[in-house]
A protein has these predicted regions:
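A structural micro-motif
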Residues: 3, 102, 119, 148-149, ...
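Catalytic beta/alpha-barrel core
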Residues: 107, 122-131, 150-157, 175-188, ...
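N-terminal capping/lid subdomain adjacent to the active-site entrance of alpha/beta enzymes
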Residues: 1-151, 156-158, 162-165, 291-316
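Shared catalytic-loop signature of beta/alpha-barrel
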Residues: 60-62, 67-72, 191-194, 198-202, ...
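Loop/helix-junction capping segments adjacent to catalytic residues or to phosphate/diphosphate-binding pockets
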Residues: 52-55, 131-135, 158-162, 174, ...
Length: 316
């Protein structure tokens, strides 16, 4: 049972404007929920509205959580509030055994970066500029990848079927590309299945997976690719954890620029699968009191522990 509940808003600035297919980010706004249970355990969850993903506005979430009490139902139109409270109640906050270490992918601010991170897996956003120019940029990037590294391409659902086919045809059989993430809009399920079945280059679902039920439907339909889960945006944590445990080699855990509270939760979830996690936060933010996690290529869930998060919470 819940003993107490609190919520606090946060605001962090990116070092540089961050461009995606849905626009340019300069500031990250979120809210952190702290839940203390009658047995003394504490859990945290973060409401982190993210452009391009379904979810309530920051103002709506803040208004609701400011008045929320443990016995109140969370309405369907507030999935991020559900996600945050589900996260706070996860058993991963209570785990006493050591978590396995997590290998991480490096997110490029731009595929034209000259000093590439020394990571085995890098991620580049596409669908931001003109098709031909972007393909040429990625071709150039592949010539500069560290030996043995792989590249993930993330379109954020911005491509048409014709554009997606152009990407797949260009890089057909390219072993340096691990997968093309969410090439088509969430609503184009037939298009996604068709692309996945007709090309050797692996695809991954991302924006499509805010509900575990959708992942299960794709799995039942024979989806051959990857499933990218953003736990902070997933409304049912218990179902998500079960799915990840059942598909550890095909699920990728990804972050959405959380504060240390949400980021630590994502790290702990990433310990459930065997793939390289799509996470990375601090290098993109201005250095501040929230820079608790090291941004190494290998991270240790639990290294930032509950007492440290409690101390940070009190400082907000």
């Amino acid at each position: 049972m819940i003993d107490s509940f609190e919520v606090k808003p946060l605001r962090r600035n990116f070092r540089e404007p961050f461009a995606t297919a849905t626009g340019t980010w300069r500031t990250r706004e979120s809210m952190v929920a702290r839940v203390k249970y009658m047995d003394g355990h504490v859990g945290f969850g973060e409401v982190a509205p993210t452009p391009g993903f379904r979810g309530e506005m920051f103002s709506d979430a803040h208004r609701f959580l400011s008045l929320w009490e443990p016995r109140m139902e969370i309405p369907d139109h507030l999935p991020l509030c559900r996600a945050a409270l589900g996260c706070a109640g996860s058993s991963l906050w209570r785990t006493k055994t050591a978590f396995p270490k997590i290998k991480t992918a490096a997110l490029l601010r731009s595929p034209e970066e000259t000093n590439l991170p020394l990571s085995n897996v890098l991620k580049a956003k596409i669908g931001v500029g003109e098709l031909g120019a972007e393909i040429a940029t990625i071709e150039n990037l592949l010539t500069r990848l560290p030996a043995g590294s792989r590249l993930r391409l993330d379109a954020n659902g911005s491509l048409s079927r014709t554009e997606a086919k152009a990407w797949l045809d260009t890089f057909e059989g390219c072993s340096q590309i691990e997968f093309l993430e969410q090439p088509l809009a969430v609503t184009d399920r037939n298009g996604l299945m068709g692309l996945a079945e007709s090309n050797s280059l692996a695809l991954a679902l991302d924006e499509s997976l805010l509900d575990v039920q959708i992942a299960e439907e794709f799995l039942a339909d024979g989806w051959p690719g990857y499933f990218v889960f953003k736990p902070t945006l997933c409304r049912d944590w218990r179902e998500m954890e079960t799915f990840l445990r059942n598909e550890p080699t095909r699920c990728v855990v990804s972050s959405v620029f959380e504060s240390p509270f949400g980021f630590e939760a994502v790290l702990r979830v990433a310990s459930l699968v065997e793939t390289v996690a799509g996470i990375g936060v601090n290098p993109l933010f201005v250095e501040d009191d929230f820079s608790l996690h090291a941004m190494d290529m290998v991270l240790q869930p639990g290294e930032v522990d509950i007492p440290q998060l409690e101390e940070l919470w009190r400082s907000i």
